[in-house]
Amino acid sequence: MKSDIEIAQSVALQPITDIVKKVGIDGDDIELYGKYKAKLSFEKMKAVEANEPGKLILVTAINPTPAGEGKSTMSIGLADALNQMGKKTMLALREPSLGPVMGIKGGAAGGGYAQVLPMEDINLHFTGDMHAITTANNALSALIDNHLQQGNDLGIDPRRIIWKRVLDLNDRALRQVIVGLGSPVNGVPREDGFDITVASEIMAILCLATDLKDLKKRLADIVVAYTYDRKPVYVRDLKVEGALTLILKDAIKPNLVQTIYGTPALIHGGPFANIAHGCNSVLATSTALRLADYTVTEAGFGADLGAEKFLNIKVPNLPKAPDAIVIVATLRALKMHGGVAKSDLAAENCEAVRLGFANLKRHVENMRQFKVPVVVAINEFVADTEAEIATLKALCEEIKVPVELASVWANGAEGGLALAKTVVRVIDQEAADYKRLYSDEDTLEEKVINIVTQIYGGKAVQFGPKAKTQLKQFAEFGWDKLPVCMAKTQYSFSDNPSLLGAPTDFDITIREFVPKTGAGFIVGLTGDVMTMPGLPKVPAAMAMDVAENGTALGLF
């Protein structure tokens, strides 16, 4: 079979002006970035606000293997299948980060015959959103350091600046740096560090803002440092929220592209789900809901991370909650959760599927807590056997969850038709009655305990010394009514990445909290989750090249 990029490059793309007509968008409603990419205008987003929202389908997954379980691919294939059934459907997905593209993942725009196009552009610089976010973030860093240099009227303690610089690359050497070295004219020497751009609070803000006014307010509410007397310093104190909004005025507009089958796709924003809230922008999802009868969206990593955050953090900012949740499972991941070594995953092992099913079962039970119907999608791989598939289907029937095999990677829309029909049937027959897991009025401590015990299956939460101090401080600052965004490994329900399956009787330790007051949540740090990833021994970048005619090579 052809590689992803060979398939993508074999497709005759339609002009984006033709694609968007399918959902009632005219040429005057978009700003073109070449023939095949566009941004949606503020005017059009405002004009459709009165429209009744369509059906919303959230795609999530079990705890993944390092290669991922195909959520984006499944989301794309499901949307294509729904359109093939005659349902007016749009996609609302995240845009890839260049760091993982060059690192472990290669391309991140779907796969096989379920891709968004032009995949080379989407995976590289796209419409420049990542660069705008990086620039806004680092402009704020420069303005903070300039404030220190020019007299420090706000009394910022250089030892307590919590705002870091960012870069859209995996670069472990930049995790901790010293800035301001050389001489007094180079600034005030202090410790600093770099995060990856998608971990920036500005990325989260862009994805939760509802318009330019809301974007500016959220930027003003960012906490960047503390004074010598331990009081928080906000962006509004520096009076630069207007400048940051100006840098982001185009980046806030959702991007329009197409799938291989011509399904319109809004791709916008890309926070990671293990260190941020893991969902595409509220603007993209809300607009898709008001343009189409069905919107398919995804949340990063497993349902314990992305879907939990989608349902607790993003949904309150949307016109409606999901009508159905699709949990993607692969037999290779279930076997891994059942104790099979990575090198042996290709061998048939029905017993391991049974043991690993505990992971999928917990995710199904967790999503049902939110009172939204659940469907399981088995993402088919060549090594899957009939006996393993039959075993998994029987286990799903035991817990009364609908299950369908999907082969969208190999067969595109046709490979997703059975899943699409089941999802539509479930939506028609089972009305969602969305219920949030916790209330804003709960304390931060109560919210964390709720997530750990109700979603992760943990026994208790241990708060480290710094976290205990912060619980008191944050209550004094009025931040304790914000939602909690857990930073945790994606590979396990616990904070130990090697504890697979569905562990119980474990504790999770919160070592510290990070205020993201502009985004409107508090991050709880567990384990050794890094906000600046490193590259693997053999980076995906080593297989990439460009032909003499400018064609991209090796993007998977």
From Swiss-Prot:
Catalytic activity line of the entry: (6S)-5,6,7,8-tetrahydrofolate + formate + ATP = (6R)-10-formyltetrahydrofolate + ADP + phosphate
Pfam families: FTHFS
UniProt-annotated binding residues for ATP: 65-72
BP GO terms, sorted: tetrahydrofolate interconversion
Single GO molecular function: formate-tetrahydrofolate ligase activity
Keyword Metal-binding: no
Pathway: One-carbon metabolism; tetrahydrofolate interconversion
Domain of life: Bacteria
Annotated family: Belongs to the formate--tetrahydrofolate ligase family.
Identification of the protein by name: Formate--tetrahydrofolate ligase 1
Organism expressing this protein natively: Streptococcus pyogenes serotype M6 (strain ATCC BAA-946 / MGAS10394)
